[in-house]
Curated annotation (Swiss-Prot):
Pfam families: RNA_pol_Rpb2_1 (PF04563), RNA_pol_Rpb2_3 (PF04565), RNA_pol_Rpb2_45 (PF10385), RNA_pol_Rpb2_6 (PF00562), RNA_pol_Rpb2_7 (PF04560). GO terms for cellular component: DNA-directed RNA polymerase complex. The gene is rpoB. Keywords: DNA-directed RNA polymerase, Nucleotidyltransferase, Transcription, Transferase. Belongs to the RNA polymerase beta chain family. GO terms for biological process: DNA-templated transcription. Residues 1185-1216 are annotated as: Disordered. HAMAP family: RNApol_bact_RpoB (MF_01321). This is DNA-directed RNA polymerase subunit beta. It comes from Mycoplasmopsis pulmonis (strain UAB CTIP). Signal peptide: none annotated.
Length: 1216
C-alpha cells in the first residue's frame, strides 16, 4: 500500500528543494530584517536634522540687535564621491571613519539697519550608515543597539509596595522625556492618609496645596474629584485652605509654600513663586513629553478606559447648531456603555460634537500659564476638559444612586508640554481608580515601552550639541562688535562634533559589531537593550523586568537572551517585528472576517491595539478559499487563552515563526526542547565559526534562505540580465533593460578580516549564460551554501558511552574530521606597528636589527618587511624596527662599560613587530600607511604598517562544539577512524555523544533531528521543519521506513576493538554540528617569566598579560590535605610574592649553590602595612627573648656584578 504523502517539495533559495511538512496554508514572506536600523537612520538624515535646526534657530543676541537665522531647507549633506564599497574599504584600511559633512546656510540679520549677509557653515561630520546597517568608526565596524525604555506618559498603579516602608500605596507617576517627574500617592493601608505630590526628588507636599496654587477652591475640588474619604482627609490636613481667606491669598500662600520645597534655599519673590509651576510643567523648553508622550497621555486620559462596561448617569447631548431646533440626544441616561459606544462618545468629544467643559466655570483662569502667555498666546484657549457622569453598576443606575464624574483631558491637545486640562484629568483618574473606575498600568508591558533606535539616539546627541553651540554663539554675539560678527566666526561646530564623536566612541549603545558569522552580524543589528542612558541598571533590575511578558508575542523573542547578569535585559526582535512612528513594536496578522482569512494584506498591530481582540494560530485548518474549517479554535484574547468559534476570530498569525527571533527560528524541533536549552542553542549558533567548506543542514527550518537573502555579505543582482563573465574575483551581468547593453560589474571579497578574526570570502553561485532577476543572489559568502545559511556540518553521530571519554558532555570525534578538513576554519590576525618621531630620534624601518638571529629575520625583504606568503611562527619578525634608546634609558652599568672600553655603545634598541606568543600562520597581506602617501595619521606618527597573518585551524582536543539544541561539549579525544564504532555496513561514526546528556536537559529536538537527518542522508533529500509547525513523529518514522531504516531510528553498532556487536542498539543518525569560537588555540597558555602586580608583587593573571595560574584557597586546601608542605611553601613564596626569596633562588639556581629558605611573602607585608595604618604595630616573636621587626621591603634589585653581566650581554661582539 503506497504511503500517504504529507509533504510538498518547495524551493528554498534559488537552488535547493526541500520536503516541507508544515500545515500553515500561507506564510508571510520576510521583509528586510535590517529595516529597524536603516529606516531610523534615513529618518534622521532626511527629516529630523531639518526639524531640529528649525527649533534652535534663530539665535538672538542678548540686546536683540543681531540675530542668526537658518535658511530653511538649506541643509546639505556632502557624501564621499566614491562608491560606498570603496569608501568603506578605504576607511577600514586607513583607520578612519566613513562619514558625510553637514553644511547649513546661515543668515546674519542686523535688526536696526535690516542688513543681511549669508554664510555656508560646516556643522559637523556625521558617520554614515552602510547598506548593511553598520558604521565604520576609526576603521572598525560598529553597530548602534536599539534601546527599550519606558515611554513618557502617566502611569497609574494600585497597591504597590514601597521598598523602604513596606506599605501599600496607590500612585500615579507622570514621566516626561525631558523635565521634572511628578509622583502623586497615598497609603492604602490607612484610611486617614492624605494624598501627597512629589516633584522630582524634593520633599512631598499635600496635593490640595498643589491644586490651590492654580486657584482651585475646596468646592471646585469636590466637584471635579468627588467626595472620597481620601480627598476629605487631605483637605482637613491642609492648613493653607482657611475659611476666612479669599482665593487670591490662598493661591499666593500655596505658591510660596511650593517654592520653599522645590527651590529650597532660594530667595522668594512674588514673580518667582507665581511662575515656578508654569515654568516647570508648561514651558516646552524645560518640560518635553515628546510626540510619543503626548500620544500616550491623550490615550490614557481619554474617557474610553473608564466608561466602558458602566452606565450613563446623564444624557449625552450633541451641540445645538440651530438654536431654534431642539438639542439631539446621542445616548440617553441609563445606557449601558459597550466598546463601540465608548469609542463613539470619545470621538464625538474629539470632533467637537459635544460641548466641552470650561475650567473657567470652576474659577480657573488662563493666568495659570503665567508669563508663558506672552510667548504662546494659544495657551489662553487651552482651558477645556471633557467629562460625563456615570453609574458604576446596574444596581446604582436603577436606584439613581452614587454618580461618578469621569474627566478626560482636551482631546485636541498636541502640545509637547503639560496643560492644566492634563493635570485635572490625571488627578480625576487617580481618585476614580481608588473607586475601581479605570485600569492601572503594567510597567513591564510593551503597551508602555518603546524602542529608541539609532536615528533618535543620534538626534538626542545633535540636540545636546546644538544646545551647547546656541549658548556659545549667544555669548560670542554679546562680546563681539556687530560689524565683526559673521555666521562662520561665531559658530563653534566642535560642540556638536565632540558630542557625536563621544557617542560613537564611548556610549554603551555603540558596540563593536559581532562578526563571528553572518547570523551573529544580523542578530547584533536586531538586538534591543534595556540598559544604557535612561534605561535600567543590571545590578538593580528585578525579576519582573527581565521576565517574558505576554505582550512580547510576535515582537520580542522569548528565547534569545544572554545567560549571565544581562539575562532578560538584552533581547532580540522577533522575526516579523516592526517599529511604528511612536517607537512602539508592532507585529503582523491577517484579518479574519466571518471565519474567512484575508491573505492579501497583513495588518500590523501594537500591543495596545490587541486589547479586546482575538487571535488564532497560523497552523489552524484553512481550506483553499481561506475559510477556517475547525469547529472550535484556540485563541489568544487580552493576553490570555480561550476557545471560540471561527466567526469570533478577529485575526490570525502570519507564520509559525512569528514569536521567535531569527536565531531561534533556525532551530528545528524547537517545540521539543526545554526553553533553557533553546536559549543556549540560539546563542551558540551566533558563536559558530565559518568553516573552510560550508554545508547547508539536511534538516533545516526554512529561514536559512531568508537569512542568506538579507545578509549584507552576499551579493545580489541590482539588474535583470544575463551573466556574461564569472571568476573568483568578479561577476559581470549584462543589463537587459539597457538599450546599449551596459554591463554591471560586481567585485567579490576574498579573505576579508572581520572584527572577530574570522574570514569573509565570497564565491559565485551563478554560471556564464545564467539569466538573473533583480534581487537574486549571485554569490555565497562564508557560512553560506547555494543561497542558504550553512554554519556547520552534517556528521554521523551516535549516542553511546566510550571508555569514559565522553563523561560530562565531552565529545569524541573521528580523525576523519581532521584529515578531511571537515571542521577546519581560517582565522586572520592583524598586527600593527607604528613609526614615531621623538626628541631622542626617529624609529627606523630596517632589516638590520641588532641582536636578532638570522632565523627570526628569514622572512624579511630588504626593507625589513615580511614577504607575503611567508609561513611564520612565534618569535619571527614581521616588521623590523629600531628605536633610539635615549640617554635616560642607559643603565649605570652600561655607562661604566662605555668608560672602561672608551666605546660608544649602540644607541638603538630592537623594537620590531614579532609574531605573538602562541600564534603562527601565513602572511596574506601587508598594508603600509605613511604621510608621504597622503594618509592621515596621528601627530608624531610617520608611518604605520599592518600585517595580516592567516591561520588554518583544524579541529583538536579542547575545541568546543555544539548542536542547534543547546547540546554543547568539549572534544576530549580524537580517535583514529579504525577505533571508532561502526555500523553494519562498516560506516564508522564521526562523533560519539553521551546519551546521559539528553534526559535531564530535555532537549529532545536533537534526537528527532538525528533520526530525520539519517533518513535525509539515505534518501538523498533535504527536509524543512519550521518551528512550531514541523515534522511530526509519525512523519519521521515514515521517512525512516522509506529509507529502509528501522522505524525506531536505533541501529546495531560494532565495537572495533573486538569486532563484536555492542549489546544494545543505539541511536545513530545525522546531526548538524558547529565548531564554536571558543577554541583551545586561543586559550592555551603558560608562563615562565612575566609581569608582577606592583602592590601584591604576585604574578598577574590572564593570557593577555602573560599571567600565571591562580593557586587559590581551595587548591591550597587540596595540597594541605595531601600533606605536601614543601610544594605548598614553594608555591606560596618563591613562585608567588616572596621578592627576596625569588631573587635569591634565581642566584642559587644560576650559580648551583644550595637553595635558600623562603622569606616573608609580600601579601603578608601588605597586611602588616594596613594594620600599621590602623595604628597597630606588628612584631614577629621567634623566641621569648628576641623580637624581630618586619622588614621595610626596600630591597636592592641586583648587585653591581649582576648588572655588569647583564649589560655586557647587551653589547654585540662587533663593537669591541
Amino acid at each position: 500500500m503506497p504511503q500517504k504523502i504529507n509533504y510538498e517539495l518547495k524551493n528554498f533559495g534559488q537552488y535547493t528543494k526541500r520536503r516541507d511538512y508544515s500545515k500553515t496554508r500561507f506564510s508571510l514572506p520576510l521583509t528586510d530584517v535590517l529595516a529597524i536600523q536603516k529606516e531610523s537612520f534615513d529618518w534622521f538624515l532626511n527629516k529630523a536634522i531639518e526639524a531640529t535646526l528649525r527649533k534652535y534657530y534663530p539665535i538672538k543676541s542678548s540686546n536683540n540687535k543681531v540675530e542668526i537665522k537658518y535658511v530653511l531647507g538649506s541643509k546639505r549633506i556632502e557624501k564621499p564621491l566614491v562608491t560606498e564599497q570603496k569608501a568603506v574599504k578605504e576607511a577600514k584600511q586607513k583607520g578612519i571613519s566613513y562619514s558625510a559633512r553637514l553644511y547649513v546656510k546661515l543668515q546674519k540679520h542686523i535688526t536696526e539697519t535690516g542688513e543681511i549677509s549669508f554664510d555656508e557653515v560646516i556643522l559637523c561630520d556625521i558617520p554614515l550608515m552602510t547598506s548593511s546597517g553598520s558604521f565604520i568608526i576609526n576603521g572598525f565596524e560598529k553597530v548602534i543597539v536599539s534601546q527599550l525604555i519606558r515611554s513618557p506618559g502617566a502611569y497609574f498603579a494600585q497597591k504597590t509596595r514601597d521598598k523602604q516602608s513596606d506599605d501599600l500605596f496607590n500612585k500615579v507617576e507622570v514621566l516626561p522625556r525631558i523635565g521634572s517627574w511628578i509622583e502623586i500617592k497615598h497609603k492604602v493601608t490607612s484610611n486617614l492618609d492624605s494624598v501627597k505630590i512629589k516633584i522630582d526628588k524634593h520633599k512631598s507636599f499635600l496635593l490640595t496645596t498643589f491644586l490651590s496654587s492654580f486657584g482651585f477652591t475646596e468646592e471646585s475640588m469636590y466637584k471635579l474629584f468627588g467626595n472620597s474619604e481620601t480627598l476629605k482627609n487631605t483637605l482637613s490636613k491642609d492648613k493653607i485652605l482657611g475659611k476666612n481667606k479669599d482665593i487670591v491669598e490662598i493661591r499666593k500662600e500655596a505658591q510660596e509654600n511650593i517654592f520653599r520645597i522645590v527651590r529650597r534655599g532660594d530667595r522668594i519673590t512674588k514673580e518667582a513663586s507665581q511662575n515656578l509651576i508654569s515654568n516647570l510643567l508648561f514651558n516646552e523648553k524645560r518640560y518635553n513629553l515628546s510626540k510619543t508622550g503626548r500620544y500616550m497621555l491623550n490615550r490614557k486620559l481619554s474617557l474610553f478606559d473608564r466608561i466602558i462596561t458602566t452606565y450613563l448617569a446623564q444624557d449625552i447631548v450633541l451641540k445645538n447648531v440651530d438654536p431654534t431646533m431642539e438639542a439631539k440626544i446621542l445616548y440617553p441616561k441609563g445606557t449601558y456603555i459597550t466598546n463601540d459606544i465608548a469609542i463613539e462618545i470619545q470621538n464625538a468629544f474629539k470632533e467637537g460634537l459635544i460641548k466641552n467643559i470650561d475650567l473657567k466655570d470652576y474659577g480657573i483662569t488662563s493666568d495659570v500659564y503665567g508669563k508663558l502667555l506672552d510667548t504662546n498666546p494659544k495657551l489662553k484657549n487651552r482651558m477645556n476638559i471633557i467629562g460625563i457622569y456615570i453609574f458604576k453598576s446596574k444596581k446604582a443606575m436603577e436606584k439613581d444612586g452614587e454618580k461618578h464624574f469621569v474627566i478626560g483631558n482636551d482631546p485636541t491637545s498636541v502640545e509637547n508640554h503639560l496643560l492644566i486640562s492634563d493635570i485635572v484629568a490625571i488627578i480625576n483618574y487617580y481618585f476614580n481608580l481608588n473607586e475601581n473606575i479605570g485600569r492601572d498600568d503594567d510597567p513591564d508591558s510593551l503597551i508602555n515601552k518603546r524602542i529608541v533606535s539609532v536615528g533618535e539616539l543620534l538626534l538626542n546627541q545633535l540636540n545636546i550639541g546644538l544646545l551647547k553651540m546656541e549658548k556659545n554663539t549667544r555669548e560670542k554675539m554679546s562680546s563681539k562688535e556687530i560689524s565683526r560678527i559673521t555666521p562662520k566666526n561665531i559658530t563653534n561646530n566642535k560642540m556638536i562634533q565632540n558630542q557625536i564623536k563621544t557617542f560613537f566612541n564611548s556610549s554603551k549603545l555603540s558596540q563593536f559589531m559581532d562578526q563571528t558569522n553572518p547570523l551573529s552580524e544580523i542578530s547584533t543589528k536586531r538586538k534591543i537593550t534595556s540598559l544604557g542612558p535612561g534605561g535600567l541598571n543590571r545590578d538593580t533590575a528585578q525579576f519582573e523586568v527581565r521576565d517574558v511578558h505576554a505582550t512580547h508575542y510576535g515582537r520580542i523573542c522569548p528565547i534569545e537572551t544572554p545567560e549571565g547578569p544581562n539575562i532578560g535585559l538584552i533581547l532580540n526582535l522577533a522575526t516579523y517585528a516592526k517599529v511604528d512612528e511612536y517607537g512602539f513594536l508592532q507585529t503582523p496578522y491577517f484579518k479574519v472576517t466571518n471565519g474567512i482569512v484575508d491573505f492579501s494584506q497583513p495588518v500590523y498591530l501594537t500591543a495596545h491595539e490587541e486589547i479586546n481582540r482575538t487571535f488564532a494560530q497560523s497552523s489552524i485548518s484553512i481550506d483553499e478559499n481561506g475559510k477556517i474549517t475547525d469547529e472550535q479554535v484556540i485563541v489568544k484574547s487580552n493576553f490570555d487563552y480561550n476557545v471560540v468559534s471561527p466567526k469570533e476570530v478577529d485575526y490570525i498569525d502570519v507564520s509559525s515563526k512569528q514569536m521567535t527571533s531569527l536565531a531561534a527560528s533556525s532551530i528545528p524541533f524547537l517545540e521539543n526542547n526545554d526553553a533553557n536549552r533553546a536559549l543556549m542553542g540560539s546563542n551558540m549558533q551566533r558563536q559558530a565559526v565559518p568553516l573552510l567548506f560550508a554545508e547547508a543542514p539536511l534538516v533545516a527550518t526554512g529561514i536559512e534562505a531568508d537569512i542568506a537573502k538579507f545578509s549584507p555579505n552576499n551579493l545580489k543582482s541590482t539588474v535583470d540580465g544575463e551573466v556574461v563573465f564569472v571568476d573568483g574575483s568578479q561577476i559581470k551581468i549584462k543589463d537587459s533593460a539597457s538599450e546599449k547593453g551596459s554591463i554591471k560589474t560586481y567585485q567579490l571579497k576574498t579573505f576579508e578580516k572581520t572584527n572577530q578574526g574570522t574570514v569573509i570570502s565570497q564565491s559565485p553561485i551563478v554560471k556564464m549564460g545564467d539569466k538573473v532577476l533583480k534581487g537574486d543572489l549571485i554569490s555565497d559568502s562564508s557560512s553560506f551554501k547555494d543561497g542558504e545559511m550553512a554554519l556547520g556540518k552534517n556528521v554521523l553521530v551516535g549516542f553511546s558511552t566510550w571508555n569514559g571519554y565522553n563523561y560530562e558532555d565531552a565529545i569524541i570525534v573521528s580523525e576523519r574530521l581532521v584529515k578531511d578538513d571537515v571542521f577546519t576554519s581560517i582565522h586572520i590576525e592583524e598586527q600593527t606597528i607604528q613609526f614615531r618621531k621623538s626628541k631622542a630620534g626617529d624609529d627606523k624601518l630596517t632589516a638590520d636589527i641588532p641582536n636578532a638571529s638570522l632565523k627570526s629575520r628569514r622572512h624579511l625583504d630588504e626593507n625589513g618587511i615580511v614577504r607575503i606568503g611567508s609561513e611564520v611562527v612565534t618569535g619571527d619578525i614581521l616588521v623590523g624596527r629600531v628605536s633610539p634608546k635615549g640617554d635616560e634609558n642607559i643603565s649605570p652599568a652600561e655607562k661604566l662599560l662605555n668608560g672602561i672600553f672608551n666605546q660608544k655603545i649602540s644607541n638603538e634598541k630592537d623594537t620590531s613587530l614579532k609574531v605573538k606568543n602562541g600564534h603562527q600562520g601565513t602572511v596574506i597581506d601587508v598594508e603600509i600607511l605613511s604621510r608621504e602617501n597622503g594618509n592621515v595619521l596621528e601627530e608624531e606618527i610617520d608611518m604605520m604598517i599592518k600585517v595580516y597573518v592567516a591561520q588554518k585551524r583544524k579541529i583538536k582536543v579542547g575545541d568546543k562544539m555544539a548542536g542547534r539544541h543547546g547540546n554543547k561539549g568539549v572534544i576530549s579525544r580524537v580517535l583514529p577512524v579504525e577505533d571508532m564504532p561502526y555500523l553494519e555496513d562498516g560506516t564508522p561514526l564521526d562523533i560519539i555523544l553521551n546519551p546521559q546528556g539528553v534526559p535531564s536537559r530535555m532537549n529532545i529536538g536533537q534526537v528527532l533531528e538525528l533520526h530525520l537527518g539519517m533518513a535525509a542522508k539515505k534518501l538523498g533529500v533535504k527536509f524543512v521543519s519550521p518551528v512550531f509547525d514541523g515534522v511530526k513523529k509519525a512523519d519521521i518514522m515514515d521517512a525512516l521506513e522509506e529509507a529502509k531504516l528501522p522505524r525506531t531510528g536505533k541501529m546495531k553498532v560494532f565495537d572495533p576493538t573486538t569486532g563484536e556487536k555492542i549489546d544494545n542498539e543505539i541511536s545513530v543518525g545525522v546531526m548538524y554540528m558547529f565548531k564554536l569560537s571558543h577554541m583551545v588555540d586561543d586559550k592555551m597558555h603558560s608562563r615562565s617569566i612575566g609581569p608582577y602586580s606592583l602592590i601584591t608583587q604576585q604574578p598577574l593573571g590572564g593570557k593577555s598579560q602573560n599571567g600565571g595560574q591562580r593557586f587559590g584557597e581551595m587548591e591550597t586546601w587540596a595540597l594541605e590535605s595531601y600533606g605536601a608542605a614543601n610544594i605548598l611553601q614553594e608555591i606560596l613564596t618563591y613562585k608567588s610574592d616572596d621578592i627576596q626569596g625569588r631573587n635569591n633562588l634565581y642566584s642559587a639556581l644560576t650559580s648551583g649553590t644550595k637553595l635558600p629558605k623562603p622569606g616573608v611573602p609580600e601579601s603578608f607585608s601588605v597586611l602588616a602595612y594596613e594594620l600599621r595604618g590602623l595604628g597597630i604595630k606588628l612584631q614577629i616573636h621567634e623566641k621569648e627573648e628576641e623580637k624581630q621587626e618586619l622588614p621595610s621591603q626596600e630591597y636592592e634589585s641586583l648587585n653591581l656584578d649582576q648588572e655588569l653581566k647583564t649589560a655586557s650581554e647587551n653589547v654585540s661582539e662587533s663593537e669591541f
